[in-house]
Amino acid sequence: MNAEIIAVGTELLLGQITNTNAKFLSEKLASIGINVYYHTVVGDNTRRLQEAIRTAEKRANILIFTGGLGPTKDDLTKETIASIVKEDLVYDEAALTSIREYFNRTGREFTENNKKQALVLKGSTVFANNHGMAPGMGLHKNEKVYILLPGPPKEMQPMYNSYVDPFLRNVTTGEHIYSRVLRFFGIGESQLEVKVQDLIDNQTNPTIAPLASDGEVTLRLTAKHQNVEQAELLIQQVEHLILERVGEFFYGYNEDFLHHKAIELLKKKGFTLACAESLTGGLFGNQVTENAGVSSVFKGGVICYHNDVKQHILQVPEETLQTAGAVSEECARYLAENVKLLLQSDIGISFTGVAGPDASENKEPGTVFIGLAIKDEPTIVFPLCLSGSRQQIRERTVKYGFYHLYKKLEEM
């Protein structure tokens, strides 16, 4: 089935707020096999909203609205949809009671216009708003499904997760929809697609949807079946075929992230980590410490941006800095080995390179070296040639650091 997301609010058109709801909803709908081909943003204007609805009805089975459910005159989503589907608006007593209780609890005066927020389309399924006042609703009418949700993300997102997701699963095909995301790193989107192109070309059930983001590639596999176990089996069969071809670049599923996976392995193996950061300037250490309980494995780090710090704190020989340079395999090796010794950790990882925008030491932006010293094993240096802005190069360098750390730990 196809859905269209219609965001209502003049503030969106003026650029006063960002439409994060569309991103959230698109991701959620994709995970249950509902296609989203159009995002529409319309201001607080009845005529233009009517036009947007009629256009959407021609190209989508499911129309999802965010915003315009509040108490003011310019909150007109419900009234406009009611006029189009020819349904009355009626008070939902549970919502009205909840709104009155909110005003009593906060000591604010309950004005008549606030009753408007409890109006719902007659015959609709009402979605309770556990984080605000205006309820949402879902109506199946004239072979279309109309979903109305509040605009504030803190209200809309939990409402979707608790009520809309099961509602949509029930009114679509009656089939179980099972989705799994495979995450890859160290391979480009085009390279990965070439290796699995025949599977993509011949996809039926499950479907395969590639997506590239920040140096990573994901494949979303979505299967439909009356039996949930059979839907999962369909996913597993295609996943096996994919990993036979590109398994060396695979690192996790769904909401797994490289830094989480690497830290999990560190904890599992009981190793400690220290880092020496030049071009990344603390980005790696920052991501490490985003993980709760990481003090058990992370000793700390040295931001060795200036050569004096490399030489006097991390004992990189002056000769190495003068001949090979700070941006070199030799320097990365010294940094990884010596930060490990300095902070008495099992593993030392180092980052040195040119973030740009200008060249340095006659080396182009994107020239990067990552050093990895693990216990008594020979130190490994990974050379990289990255592209992008200064910030993109730094962020991608950090991801490569976690990737190489994860892969090396996985081997041990």
UniProtKB/Swiss-Prot annotation:
It comes from the Bacteria. Pfam families: CinA, CinA_KH, MoCF_biosynth. SMART domains: MoCF_biosynth. Gene3D superfamilies: 3.30.70.2860, CinA-like, MoaB/Mog-like domain. SUPFAM superfamilies: CinA-like, Molybdenum cofactor biosynthesis proteins. InterPro entries: CinA, CinA-like_C, CinA_C, CinA_KH, Competence-induced_CinA, MoaB/Mog-like_dom_sf, MoaB/Mog_dom. Belongs to the CinA family. This is Putative competence-damage inducible protein.
